[in-house]
Amino acid sequence: MGLMALVMSMLLILGACGKTGLGNNSGNAGKEVTKKSAKDLKLGVSISTTNNPYFVAMKEGIDKFAGKKAISLKVADAQDDAARQADDIQNFISQNVDAILINPVDSKAVVTSIKAANNANIPVILIDRGSEGGQVLTTVASDNVEAGKMAADYIVKELGEKAKAFELSGVPGASATVDRGKGFEKVAKEKLDLLSSQSANFDRAKALNTAQNMIQGKKDVQVIFAQNDEMALGAAQAVKSAGLKNVLIVGIDGQPDAHDAIKKGDMTATIAQQPAKMGEIAIQAAIDHYQGKKVSKKTLSPIYLVTKDNVDKYNW
């Protein structure tokens, strides 16, 4: 190596060693982070919808914890519209927020927005649902595969093998839909008679109509598994309207209406999540990142099987 090349190499090494900042956190390769206190942070939050008690609870958890930490917060409701969510995220990027918290409408569609944030060196934190690409600081979610499996195992335990079952799935393309279906169907295809699986978009009214149509031709159904409580509540209405007895209704989320339905006997069980806690964990991840603390690539929030026997124990 020539003398000049050697000198230049040494200068580059010394320059790299002398850099200030907090270095790289997972999902933010290449970005030097300036240390900030919580009260100096400006965060953008994109919620998939506020027309669902689960995501309302998540938003409330975010609002409450951010308020406690004196964080400046901008929240946008995507109204279950992936294009609208993309616009909201672009607005956050234009406003140069310190981090963007995203609860994706669609795990594939959101990738473009995540990459745009990556290009702007803005950390991205995902809540409840993952993405199919882009770099994220962390994903805060329940183990949705395990939630689906837990529901299926409970059904097999209650009804035995080969029980006739319907499945109501969520928004096509959402990671929660894919993962809950994967967990449920892994058990169901071996141990249940899965008569039909149809999407109702995580929506109560759509689930009511879909379940009514499913029931018409197959009134010997023994259980309806819904990938969230809103759909489970719609299915419960359909079962009641059809005059069917002893049909198990199992959901996921643990929302207050589901707890009431379990107490009344309209629903059988739910796999409870902690949406408000997820929101709190996501905010804390942003704080930790700007304090130079290591942020785990994924943070799992606990889930619980809730039945009439323990319905008063688990609340949001």
PLM feature spans:
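A residue-level marker of the well-folded mature domains of exported/periplasmic proteins
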Residues: 16-316
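Sec-dependent N-terminal signal peptides of Gram-positive bacterial secreted proteins and lipoproteins
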Residues: 1-22
